[in-house]
Amino acid sequence: MKNKLPPFIEIYRALIATPSISATEEALDQSNADLITLLADWFKDLGFNVEVQPVPGTRNKFNMLASCGQGAGGLLLAGHTDTVPFDDGRWTRDPFTLTEHDGKLYGLGTADMKGFFAFILDALRDVDVTKLAKPLYILATADEETSMAGARYFAETTALRPDCAIIGEPTSLQPVRAHKGHISNAIRIQGQSGHSSDPARGVNAIELMHDAIGHILQLRDNLKERYHYDAFTVPYPTLNLGHIHGGDASNRICACCELHMDIRPLPGMTLNELNGLLNDALAPVSERWPGRLTVDELHPPIPGYECPPNHQLVEVVEKLLGAKTEVVNYCTEAPFIQTLCPTLVLGPGSINQAHQPDEYLETRFIKPTRELITQVIHHFCWH
C-alpha cells in the first residue's frame, strides 16, 4: 500500500544507513542484500512484482527487478546499489547518517547513487500503476563500482526489451548519450635472471619492456591519428602507462617486469578490435622473444557507449529539460543496458561529488528530479 511508504527523506535516510560497499579487496567488500530487501519491500508496497537475482561470481550480491504493467516495450529506470569504500579520516560526518546542512544532503551514496531510488519511489506515490499502458521496470544492480557484474549479468540473462532506459547516475540533470569505455591491461615480461657482470647469460626483462613500450607508444599515436569523435573534449582514444615495476637489485639481471596501462576507447570501437590492435603492436617483441610476453586483463573491460542521437528518448528528454544531450569521459553501466534498448544516463547530483569525502547531493535537485521522473513515466508508459 502506498500509505505504507515512508516519507521521501526517510527513504533516503534508510538507504544511506544501509552499507553496501563494493571493493576488490575482500575485507572491504560488502553484500548488498539488506539494501535489496529494503527496495524490494517498498516496490512491493507500490504494487510492483519483484524479482531478486543472485549475481554469480560475487560475494553475496544481488540485482533487483521491479516491474508493473503488461505488454511489450515500456521504460526501464536503472541504477546501482553499491558505493565505493570511504576514508574515515577524511570524512567530517558519519558516512552512513543522512545529514542535511546548507542546502546539501550528506552521506555515502547520496549522489552516487542510492538517492536515485528515493526519487523514483517518491515520484511513484502519485502514479496509478494499475493504469499503465506500457510496463515500467526498475532495475537495481550490484557491483557497478568494481566489475559491473550486476549489469553485465542482467543484460546477458534477461529477455526484457524495453523501448528505452534511463540510468540515474549523477549528471546534474544534464542528459548524457555517450561515453568512452575503459580497458586496463597488465603487460608482463618474463626474462632470465643472472649476475650483472655477465649480461649474455641472462635475458633482461626491463630491456624487453623498453622495446615493448616503444611499440605501445606508437600504438598511442596511431589511435590518436586514426579515430576521432569531435563531441568529446579529448576527441580520440587515450592510452596511458600508469604503473611499472621490474627487478629487485642493481647487480642482478632483471627476470620480471610488469607494466599496467589503460585505453579509453571511443563509442563504436569493439573490444576485439582494441585487443587486436594491442596484440599487433606487441607482435615484434613476441616474435623476437617467444613465450616471454603476456597480456592480461586487470579488470573486466567496459566498451564505449552511444545512444542514437535521433532516438525518441533523446528528443523527449531534451524537450523536457530544455537541454541538449552531452558526452562524458567517465564510465557507467550504459554499454550493457544499451544492448537491451536505447539508453540515456541522467540523474540528480554532480559527478564531482562522487567518490569524494563528505559526498553530498544539493537539495535544489529534489523538485526537478521528481518532476522529470514523473514526466518520463507518463510519456513512455501512459501513451
UniProtKB/Swiss-Prot annotation:
Gene Ontology CC annotations of this record: cytoplasm
EC number: 3.5.1.16
Gene that produces this protein: argE
Catalytic activity from the UniProt record: N(2)-acetyl-L-ornithine + H2O = L-ornithine + acetate
Gene Ontology biological-process entries: L-arginine biosynthetic process
Keywords: Amino-acid biosynthesis, Arginine biosynthesis, Cobalt, Cytoplasm, Hydrolase, Metal-binding, Zinc
CDD domains attached to this UniProt entry: M20_ArgE (cd03894)
Gene Ontology MF: a single term: acetylornithine deacetylase activity
Name this polypeptide is given: Acetylornithine deacetylase
SUPFAM superfamilies: Bacterial exopeptidase dimerisation domain (SSF55031), Zn-dependent exopeptidases (SSF53187)
HAMAP family per UniProt: ArgE
Source organism superkingdom: Bacteria
